[in-house]
């Protein structure tokens, strides 16, 4: 098995993964995100600000953030609108006609 050890000056203790993530958040990354992890992996200095100095649960796990930073997501196309939506848009938009007050078919001429 693997254990995680936290060392601060002369103090050392074993920590679980959740506590390790909060400690990393508190001491090394101010609200690390996918981009912060990616930058850290590339060797860039990462800094930012967080309102929760003790860490918080909204920070994703370091393992998840590192994985998402390394794997590029597939680009997905948005779904096509329904036929109903397409026909609503087509029929509800006013048609512009040059120099006429109304359509000939609407006037009965």
Curated annotation (Swiss-Prot):
Record's keyword terms, sorted: AIDS, Host cell membrane, Host cytoplasm, Host membrane, Host-virus interaction, Membrane, Metal-binding, Phosphoprotein, RNA-binding, Ubl conjugation, Ubl conjugation pathway, Virion, Zinc
Phosphoserine: residues carrying this PTM: 61, 82
Q: How is it modified after translation?
A: Processed in virion by the viral protease. Highly phosphorylated on serine and threonine residues. Thr-13 and Ser-82 are phosphorylated by the mitogen activated kinase MAP4K1. As the HIV-1 replication can be activated by stress and mitogens, these phosphorylations could be involved in this process. Ser-61 phosphorylation may inhibit elongin BC complex binding.
Q: Where does Zn(2+) bind?
A: 25, 31, 50, 56
Top-level lineage group: Viruses
Q: Phosphothreonine: which positions carry it? A: 13, 105
Any GO BP: viral life cycle
Q: What is its main location?
A: host cell
Q: How does it sit in the membrane?
A: Peripheral membrane protein
**UniProt biased composition (Basic residues):** 93-103
Q: Does the keyword Ubl conjugation apply?
A: yes
Task: Tell me the segments the record calls region Disordered.
Answer: 75-109
Region entry RNA-binding, spans:
1-31
Q: Which InterPro entries match?
A: Vif
**MF terms in GO:** metal ion binding; RNA binding
Q: For the motif HCCH motif, give the residue ranges.
A: 25-56
Region (Multimerization) residue ranges read 68-81
Q: Does the keyword Chaperone apply?
A: no
Q: Where is this region: SOCS box-like?
A: 68-97
Query: Induction of this protein: by what?
Result: Expressed late during infection in a Rev-dependent manner.
GO CC, sorted alphabetically, is: host cell cytoplasm; host cell plasma membrane; membrane; virion component
- What task does this protein carry out? Counteracts the innate antiviral activity of host APOBEC3F and APOBEC3G by promoting their ubiquitination and degradation. Acts as a substrate recognition component of an E3 ubiquitin-protein ligase complex: mechanistically, Vif hijacks a host cullin-5-RING E3 ubiquitin-protein ligase complex (ECS complex) and the transcription coactivator CBFB/CBF-beta to form an active E3 ubiquitin-protein ligase complex that targets APOBEC3G and APOBEC3F for polyubiquitination, leading to their degradation by the proteasome.
What further fact does the record state? Required for replication in 'nonpermissive' cells, including primary T-cells, macrophages and certain T-cell lines, but is dispensable for replication in 'permissive' cell lines, such as 293T cells. In nonpermissive cells, Vif-defective viruses can produce virions, but they fail to complete reverse transcription and cannot successfully infect new cells.
Assembly and partners are described as: Homomultimer; in vitro and presumably in vivo. Interacts with viral RNA and Pr55Gag precursor; these interactions mediate Vif incorporation into the virion. Interacts with the viral reverse transcriptase. Forms cullin-5-RING E3 ubiquitin-protein ligase complex (ECS complex) by interacting with host CUL5, RBX2, elongin BC complex (ELOB and ELOC) and CBFB/CBF-beta. Within the ECS complex, Vif interacts directly with host CUL5, ELOC and APOBEC (APOBEC3F and APOBEC3G) substrates.
Tell me its family. Belongs to the primate lentivirus group Vif protein family.
Which protein, by its recorded name, is this? Virion infectivity factor
| Organism name | Human immunodeficiency virus type 1 group M subtype B (isolate SC)
């Amino acid at each position: 098995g693997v254990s995680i050890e936290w060392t601060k000056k002369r103090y050392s203790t074993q920590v679980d993964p959740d506590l390790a993530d909060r400690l990393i958040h508190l001491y090394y990354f101010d609200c690390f995100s996918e981009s912060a992890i990616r930058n850290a992996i590339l060797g860039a200095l990462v800094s930012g600000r967080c309102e929760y100095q003790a860490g918080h649960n909204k920070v994703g796990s370091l393992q998840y953030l590192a994985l998402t930073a390394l794997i590029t997501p597939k680009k997905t196309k948005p779904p096509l609108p329904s036929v109903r939506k397409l026909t609503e848009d087509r029929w509800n938009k006013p048609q512009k006609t040059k120099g006429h007050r109304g359509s000939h078919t609407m006037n009965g001429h």
